Amino acid sequence: MRFRIYKRKVLILTFVVAACGFVLWSSNGRQRKNEALAPPLLDAEPVRGAGARAGDHPAISVGIRRGSNDSAAPLVAAAPQPEVDNLTLRYRSLVYQLNFDQTLRNVDKVSSWVPRELVLVVQVHNRAEYLKLLLDSLRKAQGIDNVLVIFSHDFWSTEINQLIAGVDFCPVLQVFFPFSIQLYPNEFPGTDPRDCPRDLEKNAALKMGCINAEYPDSFGHYREAKFSQTKHHWWWKLHFVWERVKVLRDYAGLILFLEEDHYVAPDFYHVFKKMWNLKQQECPECDVLSLGTYTTVRSFRDVADKVDVKTWKSTEHNMGLALTRDAYQKLIECTDTFCTYDDYNWDWTLQYLTVSCLPKFWKVLVPQVPRIFHAGDCGMHHKKTCRPSTQSAQIESLLNSNKQYMFPETLTISEKLTAALSPPRKNGGWGDIRDHELCKSYRRLQ
C-alpha cells in the first residue's frame, strides 16, 4: 500500500514537472519570437552606443559583425547569418518608412503649409561637430524661419538625430539615402568580401575570380565603397527631393544644396533673394546660382554688393549651388552620362555634363563676397586634422569685422566672364558597372 502511494506521488510529481517545463518552454519560445518580430531598440552606432531622446526616431543599430578585409577572403558567398540579416533588414525598413512618411516638423498646419522661394538640402554623413556649426550659423541667419531645411543622411546616428531634433527655428524634414554602406555593410553598394582589392592588377583579379574583376576604373583600380557613396548619395538626393518629397510636389522655387561642413553668413537668405531677382531681370541666360566660393576676401568693403556672371566650374562653384526645377530637369536627362562617367566626384561629373550632355555650358551668378563658407578643412580630400572650432572662429571673425557691409540694399553685376571650358580630367573611382546601374536606377525607384 505504501509503495502504491509513493508511486502515485512520483507520477503526479512527474506530470507537474513536465507541465511546468512545457509552460516555461512555450513562454521562452513566444518571447524569442516576439523579440525577433519587434524592432530592436538598440544604440544607433554599433561601436560607441548612445541613448535615444524622447520624441526622437527609434535608435536602431545595424548590428553587423564585420568580417576583416585585411585577410584573404574566400571567393564564395559568406555563410548566412539570419540574426544579422534580420537586424539589417529592420534598419532598411525603418529608413524606407521614414522616407515614405516624410514627417515635417516646426510648421503649424502640415496639411496646408507650403515652402516659399527657397529650400535648403543638406547632405549629412557622420561629422556631428561640423553639422553643429552649420546649425548654429543657420540659427543666426535672418529670415531662416521661412526656409524649409531638408537633411539627407547616409549614416544613422543618435547624436546627429538629436542635433536636428534641437532645430526649432525653421521647418525641418529628414530623409535617408537607402543604399548606404551602413545599410549594406557586407555587400554592394557597401564592400562585399568577394570584391577585388583596389590595387589588384586586372589579370590577377580575373584569375582570382573576384566578382568585379572585369570592371576596374580608367586607372586600373577597383571600387572603394567609401568613395563611391558620396556620388550615389548626391544623385539620389537630387532626384528624391525634386520628385518624391511630397511638400515640394508643386514647388516652383529654388533648392540650395549644402553639405554638413558648410557655414552660412547671416545675410545669405537676404542676398539669395536679391540675386534671384537680379538673375530674372538682368541675366536670364544664367543657369544656376552659387552663394559660395573659395576666394579669400578679407574686406567686404566695395564688393559686398557685387556679383559676377561666370562659366560654372566645379572647383569654384560647387558650394551653395542653387537649382531651379528647369535646371534639375535638364540634369536628370543626363542620367546615363552622369552615372557612367568615370569620376567618383559628383561635382567633377557635373563639370563633364556641362561640356558633353547639357544643351550648353552653365553660366553661374556668384557674389564676389561668399555667403556660404567651407568650414571642413579635413575630410575625403584632405589629410589634415579636423579643427572645426578653429575654422568656425576664423569665419566668425571675418563676418564680425565686416558686418557693416552685409545686407546690401541692392546688387549689381560687376563683370561677365563666360567661355566654354575644356572637358575636365577624370579622376576615376567609378568604373564598376554595379555603380553605374544603381545610379541609373534612382529615377525608377519610389
From Swiss-Prot:
GO terms for biological process: oligosaccharide biosynthetic process; protein N-linked glycosylation; protein N-linked glycosylation via asparagine. The chain crosses the membrane at residues 10-29. Residues 30-446 are lumenal. Glycans are attached at residues 69, 86. Keywords: Disulfide bond, Glycoprotein, Glycosyltransferase, Golgi apparatus, Manganese, Membrane, Metal-binding, Signal-anchor, Transferase, Transmembrane, Transmembrane helix. Residues 1-9 are cytoplasmic. Pathway: Protein modification; protein glycosylation. The keyword Ribonucleoprotein does not apply. Substrate binds at residues 123-127, 154, 229-233, 298. GO terms for molecular function: alpha-1,6-mannosylglycoprotein 2-beta-N-acetylglucosaminyltransferase activity; manganese ion binding; protein homodimerization activity. It catalyses: an N(4)-{beta-D-GlcNAc-(1->2)-alpha-D-Man-(1->3)-[alpha-D-Man-(1->6)]-beta-D-Man-(1->4)-beta-D-GlcNAc-(1->4)-beta-D-GlcNAc}-L-asparaginyl-[protein] + UDP-N-acetyl-alpha-D-glucosamine = N(4)-{beta-D-GlcNAc-(1->2)-alpha-D-Man-(1->3)-[beta-D-GlcNAc-(1->2)-alpha-D-Man-(1->6)]-beta-D-Man-(1->4)-beta-D-GlcNAc-(1->4)-beta-D-GlcNAc}-L-asparaginyl-[protein] + UDP + H(+). Disulfide bonds join 196-210, 283-286, 334-357, 339-439, 378-386. It is a single-pass type II membrane protein. Belongs to the glycosyltransferase 16 (GT16) protein family. Plays an essential role in protein N-glycosylation. Catalyzes the transfer of N-acetylglucosamine (GlcNAc) onto the free terminal mannose moiety in the core structure of the nascent N-linked glycan chain, giving rise to the second branch in complex glycans. This is Alpha-1,6-mannosyl-glycoprotein 2-beta-N-acetylglucosaminyltransferase. It comes from Sus scrofa.
